Amino acid sequence: MRDLYKELAEYMGRNYDLVKARCQTAHVELAWLWEKYKDNPIAFYRETDLYIFALTRYQYRLQEAKAHIWYQYMIKKHGWKIGLDIGGGIGEQTILAMEKGVKMVYTDIQDSRTLEYARWRFKRHGIKPWVVFEDYKIKRDFDFINAMDILEHLENPKPVIKAIHKHTEWLFCNPDQLKYNKWVPQHISKFDLTKYFKHIDLYLWRRK
C-alpha cells in the first residue's frame, strides 16, 4: 500500500501524526466553510487546502478497500490506453492509471491547492499527464473516464454526463455512495446515470 499520509506530510513539511489527524477532521472544516463560499464554489475549491487532506483520507480508504487494485485490474483487463480524470483532486486515479501504461488527461481547478499538490505528486512519481483546467470541454474520445465524487458538486451535471456518454464507453462513478447531509453541503445536485449508462461492477458503468 502507498502511504498517502506520508506523502502529504512530506509535501507539507509537517509532522506525520498531525497531518494524519487533520485528514480525519478536514471534512468537518469543509462543511463549516461552505456557508461562506456557497455562492462562489470555484473559490471554495481553489482557496482552501482542506481538500488535500480530505481527499488523502478518501483515497486511503479506497486503497484499504482494495478499490485501487480493482481499478488497475480493470484497466489491464480492458486494455485501455487513454483516460480522462475529471476533477482529479490529488491525482491518485491518474497516477494509478499511468502506472499501468495509460496516457491520462487530468483536470482540476486552475490555481487550486489540489492541483498544486497533484503536480507535486506527479513529479514525485515520475509521470507526466496532460493537465487541463475546469473550463476543459470533452471533445475527443477516451477509453474510459473517471468521475468519482465529482458530478454532485456541479450545479447542473447533466451536460457533463451527456458529454461523457458521447466520448467514452466506460465510466468510473459512485452515485450510490454519495451522501447529502449537513456534513457534505457542497454536494449540491443529484443525478441519474441510468439513462446513459448501465452499472457493471463496483464503480464501473458502461454506455448504453
Language-model regions, residue ranges each:
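A conserved beta-strand element that flanks and buttresses the S-adenosyl-L-methionine
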Residues: 146
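Conserved acidic residues
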Residues: 81, 143, 169
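Conserved beta-strand signature within the Rossmann-like core of class I S-adenosyl-L-methionine
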Residues: 168-179
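A short, conserved alpha-helix within the catalytic core of class I
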Residues: 154-163
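Hydrophobic adenine-recognition pocket in adenosine-nucleotide-binding enzymes
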Residues: 150
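Conserved N-terminal segment of class I S-adenosyl-L-methionine
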Residues: 1-138, 178-208
